[in-house]
Regions:
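Short, low-complexity disordered leader/linker segments with a strong preference
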Residues: 1-27
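A sequence-composition feature that detects small, non-aromatic residues
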Residues: 6-16, 69-71, 79, 87
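Residues at structural and domain junctions
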Residues: 9, 35-36, 82
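Loop/turn elements at helix/coil->beta-strand transitions in domains of secreted/extracellular proteins
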Residues: 26-28, 56-59, 81-85
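Extracytoplasmic "Venus flytrap"
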Residues: 30-53, 61-74, 78, 89-92
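Extracytoplasmic ligand/sensor domains, especially the bilobed periplasmic-binding protein
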Residues: 93-98
Length: 98
């Protein structure tokens, strides 16, 4: 149930965000997964949510299986090419701040 709520929240946020960008270039989205995209759990649901944005015209790309301790360089790399970057684990907080 928590996974479904998280997925709905991500999709709802982007739906609301897309309304304000009518006629404008859609933001590109980057994401970092803590596990593999087909793990049957959190990472898979996050991946499915992010990939669903592509059918609405968003440019989406991400990196999977990123260790939390080594995430800062991945976030910097994604931030250079995307307008918004999502961390899918609380453990990524320090890496995002750097």
């Amino acid at each position: 149930m928590k996974k479904l709520i998280a997925l709905v929240a991500v999709v709802a946020m982007f739906a609301a965000f897309s309304i304000s960008t009518v006629g404008k270039k859609l933001p590109s989205v980057g994401y970092v997964l803590v596990g593999p995209k087909n793990d049957g759990g959190w990472s898979m649901r996050h991946y499915q949510g992010f990939k669903s944005l592509e059918k609405h015209g968003y440019k989406v790309s991400g990196v999977e299986m990123v260790p939390e301790a080594e995430s800062s360089k991945i976030f910097r790399k994604l931030a250079r090419k995307h307008d918004i970057v999502f961390a899918t684990s609380f453990g990524y907080m320090d890496g995002m701040v750097k």
